[in-house]
Design a protein with these regions (language model features):
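Peptidoglycan glycan-strand catalytic modules in the bacterial/periplasmic cell-wall system
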Residues: 3-194
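Extended, non-catalytic substrate-recognition/exosite surfaces adjacent to catalytic cores, especially
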Residues: 27, 110, 159-161, 165-254
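Short, conserved beta-strand segments within well-ordered enzyme catalytic domains
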Residues: 2-3, 248
C-alpha cells in the first residue's frame, strides 16, 4: 500500500499481471530485436561474453556513456529470475557481477537450452506498471497478443527492456520512438532486417500503434508509482507488487 505525504492511501498494488508464453509462440521479429539489442552473440557464447564484458568495463571506466552493458542475456536472467533484484555498488557490485557470471555459465546454461533462457527472459522481465512479460505488455500497450506484433511494435517492446518506464509507448511516445530507432538500427547492423524495412518501421507514429488509455486502467499517479517501485527495488531488493509493504512517500496529490 502506498501513502502520500499526509499518510493517505493513494494506491494499492496487487499481484503483477503475468501470462507466460513459450519460445515457439514468440514472433521471430521480437526474438531478433531482443538479441540484436541486448546480446548480439547470445547464441555463440556460454553465458559470459568476455570481449563484450571487458569492452563495457573499460568504456565505463573511461566515462563513455555509449560503452554498453557488461551483462549477457543469461546474466540478466540470473539476476531477474534466480536472485534478488537489489542493485549493489562498489566492491559489493563487483562481487555480485562475478556471482552472476558464475551462475550464468555453470548453472543456467548447463541446465537450460538457449530457447528456454529466452523464455525466462521474456516472461519474467518487468515491463512497466505491474506488468511482467511480453504477452501482458503486448496486450497492455498494443491491444494484441505478442504473437501478432509487427516489426515496429516488436522494436518498441524490445527497447523497453532497458528501462521500461522511460520507454513506455503509452506515456512516453517520443522516448519510445527514439529507442525504437536504436533497436531497428541494431537489427539492421546485425543482419536481421534490411534498410528499407528499418525505414518503414521507423516511419510509423508510435501513437498510432498503442492501445487507447481506456483499455489500460491507468492510475493517475502511475508515473510516480513506477518511480517509487523502482526505488524500493533498488534500495531493498524487494518487489512491492509481490511483497506486503507499507510505503510512505512525499506525494502531494494537490
Amino acid at each position: 500500500i502506498l501513502y502520500d505525504k499526509d499518510d493517505k492511501q493513494f494506491a494499492k498494488l496487487g499481484s503483477e499481471k503475468r501470462e507466460k508464453v513459450t519460445y515457439d509462440q514468440l514472433p521471430e521479429v521480437l526474438v531478433d530485436a531482443i538479441i540484436a539489442t541486448e546480446d548480439s552473440r547470445f547464441f555463440q557464447h556460454n553465458g559470459f561474453d568476455a570481449p563484450r564484458f571487458f569492452k563495457a568495463v573499460l568504456g565505463q571506466i573511461a566515462g563513455n556513456p555509449d560503452a554498453g552493458g557488461a551483462s549477457t542475456l543469461s546474466m540478466q536472467v540470473v539476476k531477474t529470475s534466480f536472485t534478488d533484484a537489489k542493485v549493489d555498488s562498489g566492491m559489493a557490485g563487483i562481487i555480485r557481477k562475478f556471482e552472476d557470471i558464475y551462475l550464468a555459465v555453470f548453472k543456467l546454461e548447463k541446465v537450460y537450452t538457449k530457447e528456454q533462457i529466452i523464455e525466462f527472459y521474456v516472461n519474467n522481465h518487468f515491463l512497466g506498471g505491474n506488468i511482467y512479460g511480453v504477452e501482458e505488455a503486448s496486450r497492455a500497450y498494443f491491444g494484441k497478443s505478442v504473437t501478432e506484433l509487427n516489426l515496429s511494435e516488436a522494436a518498441i517492446l524490445a527497447g523497453m527492456f532497458k528501462s521500461p518506464n522511460a520507454y513506455k509507448p503509452t506515456t512516453n511516445p517520443q522516448n519510445a520512438a527514439n529507442r525504437r530507432t536504436t533497436v531497428l538500427y541494431l537489427m539492421r547492423k546485425h543482419g536481421y532486417i534490411t534498410k528499407e524495412e528499418e525505414a518503414i518501421a521507423n516511419a510509423i507514429p508510435v501513437e498510432s500503434l498503442t492501445a487507447t488509455s481506456a483499455n489500460l486502467n491507468v492510475n493517475p499517479y502511475q508515473g510516480y508509482i513506477d518511480t517509487v517501485v523502482n526505488e524500493v527495488k533498488d534500495k531493498y531488493g524487494v518487489n512491492p507488487y509481490t511483497t506486503p509493504l507499507l510505503v510512505y512517500t512525499n506525494l502531494d496529490i494537490n
